[in-house]
């Protein structure tokens, strides 16, 4: 006979890996072409001048310049890259 009760099982004990979303280059910082500016889920912030968007909604710099955040059409946030 067992001297202790069985441990049983649980349906918990899992966790997903972190996705590291958010702003990677702050407003006013100088970036090179191809630099990731921010990672997001969905198009919360849209790309503006000299900024591109990836298939996972990542915004990146198309040219060297300074990062600026602003409100665009319909008060939507936008990221621009202003040439120095």
UniProtKB/Swiss-Prot annotation:
Belongs to the bacterial ribosomal protein bL27 family. Gene3D superfamilies: 2.40.50.100. It comes from Chlorobium phaeovibrioides (strain DSM 265 / 1930) (Prosthecochloris vibrioformis (strain DSM 265)). HAMAP family: Ribosomal_bL27. The keyword NAD does not apply. InterPro entries: Ribosomal_bL27, Ribosomal_bL27_CS. Residues 1-21 are annotated as: Disordered. This is Large ribosomal subunit protein bL27. It comes from the Bacteria.
